[in-house]
């Protein structure tokens, strides 16, 4: 693993994560099963919106959760802004290949999101998320409020043993979901 903890070291960590996940066999069903158990225990999850995502290649596919919960997904606008919309809305393919709600779909108020399921290239045991570098989730997550559980979703093979570089705009996760289940972040 790269050892550089400086913010510029994120590029090395991204390269490490992309190489590591190439050909990685993720047990999507195990991750989803752990998330079902977790969501069933979260106060307000059944009545609120669960923010999930439509996966990029190499990310855990959470579409199996969609029928069981009131789920929302993001739409990425040209300037990089993420908005939140019902997951059952009509979709179009984003230029990066994932499905997203079509333009004009009604938005879900961020205040109505009760749990956020967040993808990433890698995570560390302290909740630091390493994204793709565009800052989309860095801008979205703070607007959800401090009490919303933020669950980093990944393969256990992409959870580092050491701290990832972190910058002031990075929003830490409160939980990690892997094939081994969902666990609270250690402090």
Where do the language-model regions lie?
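Surface-exposed, charge/polar-rich loops and edge strands
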Residues: 1-13, 19-23, 102-107, 111-116, ...
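N-terminal active-site beta-alpha-beta segment that forms phosphate/nucleotide-binding
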Residues: 2-112
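N-terminal start-of-chain detector that recognizes signal peptides
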Residues: 44-45, 88-91, 122-123, 146-151
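Short beta-strand segments
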Residues: 53, 74, 118-119, 152-154
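Flexible loop residues that form catalytic
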Residues: 55, 121, 181
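Alpha-helix N-cap/helix-start and coil->helix boundary motif
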Residues: 57-59, 78, 123, 137, ...
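Short polar/charged helix/loop
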Residues: 133
């Amino acid at each position: 693993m790269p050892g550089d903890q400086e913010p510029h070291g994120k590029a090395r960590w991204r390269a490490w994560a992309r190489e590591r996940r190439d050909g990685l066999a993720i047990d999507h069903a195990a991750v989803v099963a752990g998330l079902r158990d977790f969501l069933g225990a979260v106060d307000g999850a059944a009545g609120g919106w669960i923010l999930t995502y439509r996966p990029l290649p190499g990310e855990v596919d959470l579409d199996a959760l969609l029928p069981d919960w009131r789920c929302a997904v993001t739409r990425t606008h040209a300037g990089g802004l993420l908005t939140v919309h019902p997951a059952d809305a009509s979709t179009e393919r984003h230029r990066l290949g994932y499905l997203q709600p079509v333009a004009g779909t009604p938005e879900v108020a961020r205040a109505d999101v009760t749990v956020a399921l967040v993808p990433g290239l890698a995570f560390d045991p302290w909740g630091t998320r390493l994204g793709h570098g565009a800052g989309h989730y860095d801008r979205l997550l703070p607007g959800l409020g401090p009490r919303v559980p933020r669950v980093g979703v990944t393969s256990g093979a992409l959870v580092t043993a050491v701290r990832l570089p972190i910058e002031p705009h990075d929003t830490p996760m409160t939980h990690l979901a892997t094939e081994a289940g969902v666990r609270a972040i250690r402090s």
